[in-house]
Amino acid sequence: MKTRDKILYKSLELFNELGEPNVTTLLISDELEISPGNLYYHFKSKTEILTEIFGWFENEMYQLLESPNSGSDIEDQWFFLHLIFENIAKYRFIYKDVVNVLERYEEIKLRFQKIILKKREASLKILSNLQEEGSLQANDGEVEALCEHIVLTATFWLNYKLISQGELTEDVLSQGVYQVISLVAPFLDAGQREQLNELKAAYL
């Protein structure tokens, strides 16, 4: 692996483990056992490192959100949401310290806001399809409210679990998916609710 890539992957690891504000370029170079000058040759500042890693997150998230599953099978939506939560966990430092990070990096703040809007659009597309197919018994106002709650839960789920448990366990992603779908459950038809119960038994 090239030194530049090693710097990025080690930085992501340290950001996730320690939190972005607690990671310096000196720490990154020490962890990689390279000189600060070598790191500086590839990246002039931590901001450059953070911006590139955010670009990874951004590209991966957009790939997921550009093509949400439009079918009416609740299991398909379960796995789609699981992929979203996996992406959030992979770059969890962004979500764990989201207010602090976004306040200090204006460019990233604007890009993250666009991702939030895209999450909402994807949620609306899925719910609207379920609504049109008769699987979701909700009016347009309820669908709009559900979209807000879905994005809110997905965005802050890891923070909630860290605060309540002190650590992230292996089943935290499936729990997050279930919490999101549970928001929709009261509006699902009987068949979809039964399938949701089966998924809960299988994955939680």
Give residue ranges: language-model regions:
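Secondary-structure edge/capping motif, primarily at the C-terminal ends of alpha-helices
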Residues: 65-69, 95-102, 130, 134, ...
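Helix-turn-helix
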Residues: 6, 14-48, 52
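C-terminal peripheral helix-coil segments that are non-catalytic and often amphipathic
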Residues: 163-204
